[in-house]
Amino acid sequence: MSVDNPGADFDVLGGIEPSQVRVRFPPSPTGNLHVGNVRSALFNWAFARHYGGTFVLRIEDTDAARSTEESLRGVLDSLRWLGIDWDEGPEVGGPYAPYLQSERRDKYAEVVQRLIEGGYAYRDHYTREEIEALGEQAIHRDPANPCPTLSAEEIEIRDRAGEYVIRMHVPDHDISFDDLVRGRVTFTAENVPDYVIVRTGGDPLYTLVNPVDDALMGITHVLRGEDLLSSTPRQLVMYAALAELGVGSGRTPIFGHLPIVMGEGNRRLSKRDKGSGLAEYQELGYLPEGLLNYLALLGWAIAEDRDVFTKAEMAEAFDIRRVSGNPARFDPRKCLAINAAHIRMLDDDTLAAAIVPFLVRAGLVTDPPQPEQWELVRGATPLIKERLNTLSEAVDKLRFLFTADDAIEIEEKATLKPEEASVLDAAITAVEGLPEFTDVQVEQALRGSLVEGLGLKPKLAFGPVRTAITGSKVSPPLFESMALLGRESSLTRLRRARATVA
């Protein structure tokens, strides 16, 4: 394979109107979506939305042994959670239904028969050992006589027994195409042999169903991972044959191969790697917009000096020619930082509502929350907003608000010292007589009593109070937290903590 020239000057649309753009995302329902798959879905979605085209969701479930209804449901739910909506596909329908490949087998069988009759494909009755013995002679064979060393009788015997595969004939010449990301790509003839499209037993393979569905569904552009680059010349052969047979639109899609996503150790990120599955990010409380923003940066940038943007802004600015062909490294820390930026972009009501499911899961609030629980969440949200990287972090930060006063446990590292008893005594005296228990009045009372009255530095003055109120040395802003808890709870906690100090 050789690659020449960047793709920046290519005609992206290939002569069609922008609204005629049709792209597809074809996941296999064999497990949770991988972040690499999500990146591909996002780039296809952004490409379609940028041009006002059509985003097709097509399910590649021909592997019956591994495809499950549960996984299919997971794919659909995950895309909805991400906000990647599809114009055609499962549960939406469309002019090229069905969109599950398992329901399109009759179409594939019909196309295979036409390919054989047209001399584009053939039944291969050779065994693997016989093919190896042929060596280079097996690379490109005559569809009219693909097994010349077998007798007619032996071919008939193997045919009746179903002992054959169906191969696509590949012309014996180099295959070149223009890639929107990589420029001119050429594969030499010896590297693109005749290939199997239907395995023994009749199951169609990806090498058949993928380009057949592209042709039948009028797909104009194929944006996918670099790992599939080597399959492109075979698909180009199939597109050409289908066009000559009058199958589909007769148009060969324009390809763009996205950079590989690398994980730790400079290895390609795989499904087995920690941090590669979408479900992990949902569980941790990443925002869909934050995760998509970071995945967009794996090979593309909205501007040289800007990393944070929305999905809508990406769609408006997206240019496939600006996608880099170099491998993109997945950086968990940057992903976390981008997510934190998106959390800070939310208004307080929206963020509070997003936090609630994590508090429910932790057993801190009911589902739905009681009115007083919601008021606590809503009141505390602006206190922790700047400190959150993920939504799940809110659980530990807010746990003290939803814990009974007599159940607050002081962390070992925050254990109160005997000399801090006087601080707690002064704090109790300072706040128990306040006319109003607001954060401003609590702060004024405690500063006056502890900092000015006892002559303590703020850290030494407020540390024991924070421990008594929250059980920890680290918490949301102290005075606002006490105001949220109210006078009674705050005093109960202060007195209970004071009783534990000798």
Which role fits each region the language model picked out?
Residues 242-247, 254-408, 470-502:
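Catalytic adenosine-cofactor/nucleotide-binding cores of aminoacyl-tRNA synthetases and other
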